[in-house]
Structure formats: C-alpha cells, structure tokens
Amino acid sequence: MTEQKYVVALDQGTTSSRAVVLDHDANIVSVSQREFTQIYPQAGWVEHDPMEIYATQSSTLVEALGKAGIRSDEVAAIGITNQRETTVVWNKETGKPVYNAIVWQCRRTATICEELKARGLESYIRDNTGLVLDPYFSGTKIKWILDNVEGAREQAEAGQLLFGTVDTWLVWKMTQGRVHVTDYTNASRTMLFNINTLQWDEKILAEFNIPLSMMPEVKKSSEVYGQTNIGGKGGTRIPIAGIAGDQQAALYGQMCVQAGQAKNTYGTGCFLLMNTGQEKVTSHNGLLTTLACGPRGEPAYALEGAVFMGGASIQWLRDELKLISDARDSEYFATKVDTSNGVYVVPAFTGLGAPYWDAYARGTIVGLTRGVNSNHIIRATLESIAYQTRDVLDAMQADSGIKLSALRVDGGAVANNFLMQFQADVLDTEVHRPKVTEVTALGAAYLAGLAVGFWDGLEELQGKAEIDRSFKPHHDEEKRQRRYKGWKRAVKCAQAWAVLHNEEE
C-alpha cells in the first residue's frame, strides 16, 4: 500500500476556491486557487453560482495534486473549510440548485427580518441560536428562496429539496449525492440550530416555514463523513474527514482551542473569535454566541464579532476610488503621512455588524478639510479596520470578563505592517502574526488529519504555531482615547442613514 503522506484542505471562500496540500510536518507543499463570479442582481444583493463554486473547487483539488506530482492514493484525508451562512438549495433528484447561492453579504432579507421581529421572535432566536435576527444568517435566505422561487415551496414540502451551507453542497457533490451532512460550526450559523440542545430547532423551522427534511445531518468537525474519488485515478477514494466554517477553522488553525484564546482574521470582513470552552457566554454587547471546535473537533462555545468590511474597504480604494492600483500599495501611501489629518472613514457599505447591528448604516467619510489628500483617505480607511476590531474586542472582553493578553491575527491584510502596528496601538495589546498565515486551511487540514490518525493529537501540532512578528503598542493613553472617541463620533454619522435617505425620496 502507498504511504499516505499528505492532507488536503479545500478552502472555499467568498471570492475564490483554493486547495492547499500539507505534508506530515504541516508544511504547505502545493496551492491552487481559482476566482469565481460575483453576481449582483440589484443593490445590496449578492449571489454565487453553486455549480461554479463546485467546478472551481474540484479543479483546484486536481490542480494542486497535479502541480506537486502527488497521486490521490498518497492523500490521507480532505478537510473542507468554507464561507459561512451562504445558502444553497437544490433538488435532490436532479442535483441542480433551484436558485443561485445567496451569499452571507446579501441584505435582501432585511424586510423578512423586520417581520420576524414584529412577531416577537427576536429573543427566542437570540437565546437558542446565539445569533441576532439579521439577513447575514442562512435562515431567512432559505425562506426567501422558498417564498420567491417558482415551485420551490411545493418541491420542499414534497421532500425533494435539500439545503446546505457551502460545505454541505461540496460534500454532497463530491460523494455523488450520497452524503448530506454539515458540522456544528456551520450549523450554528444558520439561525435554525439550537446551540443548547445541539439539534435543529423545530420551533424556528416552523416559524420560518422550512421543512426539517431539507436540513443536513450535523456531525462534529473532525470525523470521516464520506469518501470522494475526485482527483483520484483508478477509483482511489479519499476520506472527507474535516469540516469547519472558515472562521472556526482559523481559530483551530491558530490553536485557540482553550477558553479565553482569541484570534482576528482580516479577510473580506474581519472576524474576531474567542473560544469560551464548554461555557456558553451570552453577550450583552451585540456579539454572537456560536459554536467552535474543541481540541478533538468536538463542539465548544465561542463569542464572535463580525466586521462586514475589512479588506473589502481596501479593494474599494483600488476598484471604485482608483486611489491605489494594488491593495499592497495601501501601506506605502498610508505611511507617507503621519496621521489621517482628522479624517475618519466608516466603511459601512452594507450596514454595520457587531456590536452595532445596523442594517441601515451606510459608508461615510468625515472630517474633510482642504488639506486632506488621497494618502489621508487611504490611511483613514486602513485605520477603520483597526477601530472596528477594537469595537468588537471591547465588547468581547466585557462579556467574557477576560482581558486578552495578546491577539493572534491572520488573513490577507496582516501582511500590512502599518495596519498591524496601528492595531496594537489602538487596542493597547500585543498583536501576534504567525509564520504560516494560511491558518484557515491549516485548521481544516488538522481536523481532517486528526480524524484519520494522520496526526495523533494537537500536541504534535503545537510547535507549528510559530510567531513571525509581535507588534507592541506605542501610543500614549490620552492619544489612544482621543482618536477612538473621534471614531465613535464618525460611526454615529453613518448610522441609520438608509432609513433617512428613503424618507427623502
């Protein structure tokens, strides 16, 4: 029998599908990435084509193995990590989606959320799912598809439709429709899963008019769910053995498996997660209570704060404002000026996430004077990412009663030294950047590898979490508080803007 030397992580993100191959020492051997189409049918709506998601993801698997000359029988397991909340509904007979995937960023269900609030469901949802009633989560997206796609409601009631977050869709496709499964971390993002009983919540399903028959089976994040022969020659079947939503996978990849450990991922959005172990901490500050992974991939509780616009605001500087030609240039221009010259950018393009939860907030730039130039605006945009992180971390520390000793960071924007130093200054906390910044893929690979015995336990992997650089806070306290006060004033200017605007039309 061929020696199994590798584990593959499939990282299905918001803008691209990636495959990352790791060896036994958790070194990255090969990476393949493909972008796919973003569909914007109207303002505030975001969709993906589920068939394109699957096509790009399966081709990256074949490509990553091919690039490194790895045969499929050398792969011990596949782990999947995915953009969370994004909703796919498909017909189990034809295998075809009844509608495009509705993406986590999509705000089309804001009115459904208002109706559900008016019916008094908010506190039940909060207490039992740990989430706030917001268009972000899958529940109202499924309801929208069933209510608006012709024939969908009838098919669902006849037991012909299946729902899945992206992990579920990929596993279903990769196993030729044999396995309909998700893990606790993804289930906890649907707004339909009871995090107290660890079961689908039948009361919420009934209120949303979603049949239980559509829901996948929920399993822990580290176990063999099924086998796939994608990328396999001669019928080799590779076990699919790990699943976790991208943020929980990153938390695991950063080795934050004990209560009180936290990380921030700077991707399209920013996601701060703190593991709270077996204790469910209820937030009084607009954070989410959600499920993460314990040391062996079993469900553990976590607090989460989501910032909708992190790296996406740098893309906006590049694509819409044309102030930079490459996202990496933002650091160079931001450091050409000493301060933002009193300017604050609040990138609330799709509303504000934690701790504000204002779907009607809109982006704003305040403090403009004649002396403000493009470098100040670039700097203020980067600073907004750090301020939003502080908003969330302050809330997290208040809820958990834990003062963070250091923040572990990952994601594309952590390569920006200016942003990382400013983050440490704003938080008055050390920021630790790991050597391997592919922590989301690492997390999925670890979960899969542990399930099949490729690694014995986390102790074996602890040494992999090396720190590349620590950023220590510099600012004096008075300056720190003054700047943060200015940020809070700027946020007030952005809040509830869309409501006011609609009244004027």
Curated annotation (Swiss-Prot):
HAMAP family: Glycerol_kin (MF_00186)
Similarity remark: Belongs to the FGGY kinase family.
Alphabetic keyword roster: ATP-binding, Glycerol metabolism, Kinase, Nucleotide-binding, Transferase
Pfam families found in the cross-reference section: FGGY_C, FGGY_N
GO cellular component, one term: cytosol
Gene: glpK
Function: Key enzyme in the regulation of glycerol uptake and metabolism. Catalyzes the phosphorylation of glycerol to yield sn-glycerol 3-phosphate.
Name recorded for this polypeptide: Glycerol kinase
Binding site for ADP: 14, 18, 268, 311, 412, 416
Coiled coil ranges: none
Pathway: Polyol metabolism; glycerol degradation via glycerol kinase pathway; sn-glycerol 3-phosphate from glycerol: step 1/1
Reactions listed under catalytic activity: glycerol + ATP = sn-glycerol 3-phosphate + ADP + H(+)
EC number(s) from the headed UniProt entry: 2.7.1.30
Binding site for glycerol: 84-85, 136, 246-247
Molecular function as annotated in GO: ATP binding; glycerol kinase activity
NCBIfam families (alphabetical): glycerol_kin, PRK00047.1
Annotated signal peptide: none
InterPro entries in the cross-refs: ATPase_NBD, Carb_kinase_FGGY, Carb_kinase_FGGY_CS, FGGY_C, FGGY_N, Glycerol_kin
Organism: Vibrio cholerae serotype O1 (strain ATCC 39541 / Classical Ogawa 395 / O395)
Recorded superkingdom: Bacteria
Alphabetical GO biological process terms: glycerol catabolic process; glycerol metabolic process; glycerol-3-phosphate metabolic process
Activity regulation as described: Inhibited by fructose 1,6-bisphosphate (FBP).
Residue sites binding ATP per the record: 14-16, 268, 311, 315, 412
Phylogenetic classification of the source organism: Bacteria, Pseudomonadati, Pseudomonadota, Gammaproteobacteria, Vibrionales
